[in-house]
């Protein structure tokens, strides 16, 4: 309902970055475009994932606060690397898998990247609307170049492993399929935790650490998308590269 009270400029500043990234990833899917209904449902599942994550984070925060002082080092490490990271990335992954794992449309390895990024950007879009409604245009502009593409990057890493898991599963290699499904949650959660932990450190020198981390995250994610798009193969199409491993 807060959308009814937001300035159209604020809404545009919030929505446009996510839409831009959605289009870029969609166009990178060179073999076979994904059904629009499926992609829309993934965006909506990303929105729903924010609700699940918020409830888990509230519970986790209350429990953690009863053990450690708020903003102490142990508190922040557990909060960002465990509670926030796994609540958000875990919720995204569960909803992603329930919708796509057995879908007939999931027939190319790069589809995993497309699906995971769409869920992640649905999450980022709704989360961003909430922040911008509270804090205004300056927050929208900052998050447009940090948090929104950050969620997209987490989605790229999730999708790379998710697509590989599907390929291994199709080949009957269930051990590696399970390993990749685990990594599809673990890797983005670790990156997400590092992002939040560095971003909230009060040392002024950490601003440079955060900048380097974000630029490296963006660069590697872009490389993964480009290589994955170029080397994409149909999952049941015989031998082909499992890009990046």
Regions found by a protein language model. Name each.
Residues 1-245:
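Hydrophobic alpha-helical segments at protein termini of multi-pass membrane proteins
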């Amino acid at each position: 309902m807060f959308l009814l009270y937001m300035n159209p400029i604020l809404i545009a500043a919030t929505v446009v970055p996510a839409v831009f990234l959605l289009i870029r990833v969609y166009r990178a899917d060179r073999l076979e475009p994904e059904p629009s209904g499926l992609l829309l449902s993934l965006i909506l599942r990303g929105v729903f994932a924010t609700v699940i994550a918020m409830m888990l984070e509230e519970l986790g925060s209350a429990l953690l606060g009863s053990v450690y002082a708020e903003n102490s080092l142990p508190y922040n490490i557990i909060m960002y690397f465990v509670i926030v990271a796994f609540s958000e990335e875990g919720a995204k992954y569960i909803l992603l898998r329930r919708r796509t794992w057995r879908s007939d449309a999931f027939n190319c390895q790069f589809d995993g990247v497309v699906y995971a990024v769409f869920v992640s950007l649905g999450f980022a879009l709704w989360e961003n609307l909430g922040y911008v409604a509270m804090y205004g245009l300056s927050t929208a502009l900052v998050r447009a170049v940090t948090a929104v593409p950050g969620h997209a990057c987490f989605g790229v890493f999730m999708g790379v492993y998710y697509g590989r898991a599907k390929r291994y599963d199709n080949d009957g290699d269930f051990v590696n399929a399970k390993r990749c499904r685990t990594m599809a949650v673990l890797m983005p959660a670790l990156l997400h935790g590092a992002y939040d932990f560095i971003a909230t450190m009060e040392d002024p020198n950490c601003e440079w650490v955060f900048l380097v981390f974000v630029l490296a995250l963006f660069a590697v994610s872009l490389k993964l998308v480009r290589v994955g798009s170029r080397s994409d193969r149909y999952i049941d199409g015989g031998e082909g590269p499992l890009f990046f491993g």
